[in-house]
Amino acid sequence: MGQQALSQHRKHRGYRTQKVVAEYLKTWYPFAESTGAGRQGSDILGTPFDIEVKAVTKFSPLAWIKQIKERKSDKLSFIVLRCNGQGEKVEDYVVLLP
């Protein structure tokens, strides 16, 4: 797989991860929706949380915590991690609180 194709694959995986997390949260928050790409702030709207979703290859928790803290949200913030090798079963994802 070429570098450009790999980059596109990672972006698609990230967008797909946001979507499956939003769908999962709809059980409790029916208006939960993925924001898509290129938007500042929470990756999922329609919940009382500030959520950063990451589909990751490298484990960089300090960078992600810094990113979410810089938003200065008055909501409870957390980071949802989909590690390499994980499918779309959101219950198996990791959550970090900054």
Feature names for model-found ranges:
Residues 1-96:
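Catalytic phosphate/metal-binding cores of nucleic-acid and nucleotide-processing enzymes, i.e., regions
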